[in-house]
Amino acid sequence: MTRPLVPSLALLGTLSLAAPAGAQSAAALASADAAQMSIAAARQKSYPGSALTVRQTLAPGMNYRRFVVSYLSEGLRINALLTVPNGTPPKGGWPAIVFNHGYIPPQVYRTTERYVAYQDAFARAGFVTLKSDYRGHGGSQGEALGAYFAPGYTTDVLNAVSSLRRDGRVNGDRIGMWGHSMGGFLTLRAMVIDPRLKAGVIWAGVVGDYSTILNDWNNVPPASIPRRVLELRQKAVAKYGTPEANPTFWRGLSANSYLKDLGGPLQLHIGTADADVPLLFHERLASQMRAAGKPVQSYVYPGDNHDLTRNLGTALARSVAFFKARL
């Protein structure tokens, strides 16, 4: 039986050499290599996670408790927002959802801010939820190198999954993932790396393969992304060539190439007026899922934006119902 969450400051002493939030050292940037993003490489790594350590007890929700917790990912202390339903867990433990947030400037990110209403909807429905900061965000250790050309964030969410599986109140066979925008990219990757994940919901996800991301994603990057992080894309193309010149390499990095390995269905949501993520990403993934013989639900909201503001209640209700049916 896994120990319950216990407040501790021990890790603060052993892991005190953290880079400031959002920092990128020359050494970390130099060591980043797009080949580390291959699905095959990710499957060779271990993701042991750790016990969840309470850092702060927050005001409770309507029918659940809230905590800032931390867990370990490659020796880094990663903070996360955890919710736990009130009452006695069902036989085998509560179902759980790892909650993957979209891009927020790491230096302004706070564990307890953003996505509050989203996470609350799943928490009220009887799920344990865990929203990871990702490394280099807020008070979490490590360096924020982005999701697309460095593997750190993927590693962090997979260690979040393992940390939930270690917790005695969670049913390790009933864990799913929710992801928004960049978090949708992480969700799809995590699910093809770990087929024990039973279901995924992706809102406005960056879910194109690398050919699509490099060729068909023409939005202007946020000014808050450091130039040196943006240059990881140019570094990758300079070293490995374009997707047209080296298709085998880039297919190996794309979760879309491994959809047959998914351990459960996907539910996809997007608005047609999304100014950040092209509708094309959503449509192609839905088509690829059907071609792979995998179950997928696709919801397109006419005129809605990146956050599905006009249809928030509907999208949340559909997402909660999906997880209730699949976990």
Task: Describe the predicted segments one by one.
Residues T2-L5, L11-Y64:
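N-terminal targeting or regulatory segments adjacent to alpha/beta-hydrolase or S9 domains
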Residues S46-K91:
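N-terminal cap/lid segment of alpha/beta-hydrolase-fold proteins
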Residues P89-W94, F99-Q141, D209-Y210:
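Short substrate-entry loop that stabilizes the transition state in hydrolases
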Residues Y148-G168:
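Alpha/beta-hydrolase active-site loop
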Residues V170-S181:
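Alpha/beta-hydrolase fold nucleophile elbow
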Residues R189-P243:
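Hydrolase active-site cap/lid region
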Residues L262, L268-I270, D274:
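Short beta-strand/loop motif that positions the catalytic acidic residue
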Residues D276, E283-L327:
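C-terminal catalytic histidine-bearing segment of alpha/beta-hydrolase fold enzymes
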